[in-house]
From Swiss-Prot:
The keyword Nucleotide-binding does not apply. It comes from Homo sapiens. Gene3D superfamilies: Cystine-knot cytokines. This is Sclerostin domain-containing protein 1. The lineage of its organism: Eukaryota, Metazoa, Chordata, Craniata, Vertebrata. One of its GO terms (molecular function) is BMP receptor activity. Keywords: Disulfide bond, Glycoprotein, Secreted, Signal, Wnt signaling pathway. Belongs to the sclerostin family.
Length: 206
Protein backbone atom coordinates (compact mmCIF):
# COMPACT_ATOMS: atom_id res chain seq x y z
CA UNK A 1 0.00 0.00 0.00
CA UNK A 2 1.21 3.44 -0.89
CA UNK A 3 0.95 6.27 1.58
CA UNK A 4 -1.87 8.83 1.03
CA UNK A 5 0.61 11.54 0.07
CA UNK A 6 1.82 9.52 -2.91
CA UNK A 7 -1.81 8.92 -3.98
CA UNK A 8 -2.30 12.68 -3.89
CA UNK A 9 0.61 13.21 -6.32
CA UNK A 10 -0.25 10.25 -8.57
CA UNK A 11 -3.85 11.32 -9.14
CA UNK A 12 -3.02 14.47 -11.18
CA UNK A 13 -0.40 12.51 -13.09
CA UNK A 14 -2.98 9.89 -13.98
CA UNK A 15 -5.36 12.59 -15.15
CA UNK A 16 -2.66 14.12 -17.36
CA UNK A 17 -1.91 10.71 -18.87
CA UNK A 18 -5.62 10.14 -19.51
CA UNK A 19 -5.94 13.46 -21.36
CA UNK A 20 -2.89 12.74 -23.50
CA UNK A 21 -4.30 9.34 -24.43
CA UNK A 22 -7.60 10.91 -25.44
CA UNK A 23 -5.78 13.51 -27.48
CA UNK A 24 -3.81 10.82 -29.26
CA UNK A 25 -7.00 8.99 -30.11
CA UNK A 26 -8.58 12.15 -31.44
CA UNK A 27 -5.52 12.90 -33.54
CA UNK A 28 -5.66 9.40 -34.97
CA UNK A 29 -9.28 9.70 -35.93
CA UNK A 30 -8.70 13.06 -37.58
CA UNK A 31 -5.85 11.69 -39.65
CA UNK A 32 -7.95 8.71 -40.61
CA UNK A 33 -10.92 10.72 -41.77
CA UNK A 34 -8.83 13.36 -43.49
CA UNK A 35 -8.28 10.97 -46.41
CA UNK A 36 -11.97 10.48 -47.06
CA UNK A 37 -13.11 12.43 -50.12
CA UNK A 38 -16.42 14.15 -49.79
CA UNK A 39 -18.88 13.37 -52.58
CA UNK A 40 -19.18 16.24 -55.03
CA UNK A 41 -22.76 17.35 -55.63
CA UNK A 42 -23.89 16.43 -59.12
CA UNK A 43 -24.37 19.44 -61.36
CA UNK A 44 -26.47 19.21 -64.50
CA UNK A 45 -24.09 18.90 -67.42
CA UNK A 46 -24.33 21.48 -70.14
CA UNK A 47 -25.24 20.72 -73.74
CA UNK A 48 -21.71 21.46 -74.91
CA UNK A 49 -20.23 18.67 -72.79
CA UNK A 50 -22.88 16.25 -74.01
CA UNK A 51 -22.13 17.17 -77.60
CA UNK A 52 -18.41 16.69 -77.02
CA UNK A 53 -19.02 13.23 -75.60
CA UNK A 54 -21.29 12.23 -78.47
CA UNK A 55 -19.00 13.64 -81.13
CA UNK A 56 -15.89 11.95 -79.80
CA UNK A 57 -14.42 14.99 -78.11
CA UNK A 58 -14.48 17.18 -81.21
CA UNK A 59 -15.28 20.83 -80.73
CA UNK A 60 -17.80 22.29 -83.17
CA UNK A 61 -18.13 26.03 -83.04
CA UNK A 62 -20.91 28.07 -84.50
CA UNK A 63 -18.49 29.82 -86.82
CA UNK A 64 -18.12 26.64 -88.85
CA UNK A 65 -21.78 26.85 -89.84
CA UNK A 66 -21.76 30.55 -90.56
CA UNK A 67 -23.24 31.44 -93.90
CA UNK A 68 -20.49 33.91 -94.63
CA UNK A 69 -17.72 31.32 -94.39
CA UNK A 70 -15.82 30.35 -97.51
CA UNK A 71 -16.76 27.01 -99.01
CA UNK A 72 -14.37 24.93 -101.07
CA UNK A 73 -15.76 24.47 -104.55
CA UNK A 74 -15.09 21.62 -106.95
CA UNK A 75 -16.01 20.59 -110.50
CA UNK A 76 -18.28 17.76 -111.40
CA UNK A 77 -15.92 16.32 -113.99
CA UNK A 78 -17.24 14.88 -117.23
CA UNK A 79 -15.31 12.05 -118.87
CA UNK A 80 -15.48 11.48 -122.61
CA UNK A 81 -14.24 8.76 -124.94
CA UNK A 82 -13.76 9.69 -128.58
CA UNK A 83 -11.78 8.88 -131.69
CA UNK A 84 -9.41 11.39 -133.27
CA UNK A 85 -9.56 11.92 -137.03
CA UNK A 86 -7.90 14.33 -139.44
CA UNK A 87 -10.26 13.58 -142.31
CA UNK A 88 -8.27 10.75 -143.87
CA UNK A 89 -6.92 8.86 -140.83
CA UNK A 90 -8.59 7.78 -137.59
CA UNK A 91 -7.09 6.84 -134.26
CA UNK A 92 -6.70 3.15 -133.63
CA UNK A 93 -7.77 3.26 -129.98
CA UNK A 94 -10.25 5.69 -128.44
CA UNK A 95 -8.99 8.66 -126.45
CA UNK A 96 -10.21 9.17 -122.91
CA UNK A 97 -10.08 12.68 -121.49
CA UNK A 98 -11.76 15.06 -119.07
CA UNK A 99 -14.12 17.76 -120.22
CA UNK A 100 -14.15 20.74 -117.87
CA UNK A 101 -17.70 21.79 -118.59
CA UNK A 102 -19.46 20.48 -115.52
CA UNK A 103 -21.15 22.42 -112.77
CA UNK A 104 -19.18 23.95 -109.90
CA UNK A 105 -20.52 22.82 -106.55
CA UNK A 106 -19.29 22.78 -102.94
CA UNK A 107 -17.21 19.71 -102.18
CA UNK A 108 -19.70 18.29 -99.63
CA UNK A 109 -22.41 18.34 -102.33
CA UNK A 110 -20.38 16.43 -104.90
CA UNK A 111 -21.27 12.73 -105.24
CA UNK A 112 -17.76 11.50 -104.39
CA UNK A 113 -17.64 13.46 -101.11
CA UNK A 114 -16.97 11.18 -98.11
CA UNK A 115 -17.87 13.67 -95.36
CA UNK A 116 -21.24 14.35 -93.84
CA UNK A 117 -24.20 15.96 -95.52
CA UNK A 118 -24.18 19.61 -96.39
CA UNK A 119 -27.18 21.82 -96.94
CA UNK A 120 -27.84 22.29 -100.63
CA UNK A 121 -30.37 24.96 -99.75
CA UNK A 122 -27.53 27.20 -98.61
CA UNK A 123 -25.70 26.73 -101.90
CA UNK A 124 -28.83 27.32 -103.99
CA UNK A 125 -29.15 30.75 -102.45
CA UNK A 126 -25.77 31.74 -103.82
CA UNK A 127 -25.15 32.55 -107.46
CA UNK A 128 -23.62 29.43 -108.96
CA UNK A 129 -22.91 31.25 -112.23
CA UNK A 130 -20.05 33.13 -110.58
CA UNK A 131 -17.93 29.96 -110.80
CA UNK A 132 -16.76 28.31 -114.00
CA UNK A 133 -15.17 24.93 -114.50
CA UNK A 134 -11.88 25.43 -116.38
CA UNK A 135 -8.83 23.33 -117.24
CA UNK A 136 -6.35 22.93 -114.42
CA UNK A 137 -3.74 20.34 -115.49
CA UNK A 138 -2.88 19.00 -118.92
CA UNK A 139 -0.37 16.60 -120.41
CA UNK A 140 0.93 15.83 -123.88
CA UNK A 141 0.04 12.42 -125.30
CA UNK A 142 1.00 10.73 -128.54
CA UNK A 143 -1.77 9.05 -130.47
CA UNK A 144 -1.45 6.88 -133.57
CA UNK A 145 -3.85 7.20 -136.49
CA UNK A 146 -4.59 4.54 -139.10
CA UNK A 147 -5.12 5.75 -142.64
CA UNK A 148 -7.21 4.17 -145.40
CA UNK A 149 -4.18 3.34 -147.55
CA UNK A 150 -2.62 1.34 -144.70
CA UNK A 151 -0.15 3.96 -143.53
CA UNK A 152 -0.06 5.36 -140.02
CA UNK A 153 0.40 8.84 -138.61
CA UNK A 154 1.39 9.97 -135.15
CA UNK A 155 0.10 13.16 -133.59
CA UNK A 156 0.82 14.92 -130.32
CA UNK A 157 -2.28 16.16 -128.58
CA UNK A 158 -2.94 17.87 -125.27
CA UNK A 159 -5.18 15.96 -122.88
CA UNK A 160 -6.87 17.49 -119.83
CA UNK A 161 -6.17 15.56 -116.64
CA UNK A 162 -7.74 17.80 -113.97
CA UNK A 163 -10.31 20.56 -113.69
CA UNK A 164 -10.80 23.43 -111.28
CA UNK A 165 -13.37 26.08 -110.49
CA UNK A 166 -12.48 29.68 -111.22
CA UNK A 167 -14.50 32.55 -109.90
CA UNK A 168 -15.47 35.35 -112.26
CA UNK A 169 -16.84 38.72 -111.31
CA UNK A 170 -19.76 40.42 -112.98
CA UNK A 171 -17.37 42.55 -115.01
CA UNK A 172 -15.86 39.42 -116.55
CA UNK A 173 -19.29 38.07 -117.40
CA UNK A 174 -20.41 41.35 -118.94
CA UNK A 175 -17.20 41.75 -120.92
CA UNK A 176 -17.52 38.24 -122.35
CA UNK A 177 -20.99 39.07 -123.71
CA UNK A 178 -20.46 42.66 -124.80
CA UNK A 179 -17.02 42.53 -126.38
CA UNK A 180 -18.54 42.52 -129.89
CA UNK A 181 -20.56 45.69 -129.31
CA UNK A 182 -17.55 47.68 -128.18
CA UNK A 183 -16.58 50.55 -130.45
CA UNK A 184 -13.18 50.27 -132.16
CA UNK A 185 -10.40 52.08 -130.37
CA UNK A 186 -9.09 55.29 -131.83
CA UNK A 187 -5.63 55.11 -133.39
CA UNK A 188 -2.95 56.31 -131.05
CA UNK A 189 -0.92 59.22 -132.32
CA UNK A 190 2.82 58.89 -131.72
CA UNK A 191 4.93 61.63 -130.16
CA UNK A 192 6.98 62.16 -133.32
CA UNK A 193 3.89 62.75 -135.40
CA UNK A 194 2.67 65.25 -132.82
CA UNK A 195 5.99 67.13 -132.97
CA UNK A 196 5.88 67.23 -136.75
CA UNK A 197 2.32 68.50 -136.70
CA UNK A 198 3.25 71.24 -134.22
CA UNK A 199 6.26 72.28 -136.35
CA UNK A 200 4.17 72.45 -139.50
CA UNK A 201 1.58 74.57 -137.74
CA UNK A 202 4.31 76.98 -136.56
CA UNK A 203 5.70 77.34 -140.10
CA UNK A 204 2.26 78.02 -141.47
CA UNK A 205 1.67 80.68 -138.83
CA UNK A 206 4.94 82.41 -139.67
Amino acid sequence: MLPPAIHFYLLPLACILMKSCLAFKNDATEILYSHVVKPVPAHPSSNSTLNQARNGGRHFSNTGLDRNTRVQVGCRELRSTKYISDGQCTSISPLKELVCAGECLPLPVLPNWIGGGYGTKYWSRRSSQEWRCVNDKTRTQRIQLQCQDGSTRTYKITVVTACKCKRYTRQHNESSHNFESMSPAKPVQHHRERKRASKSSKHSMS
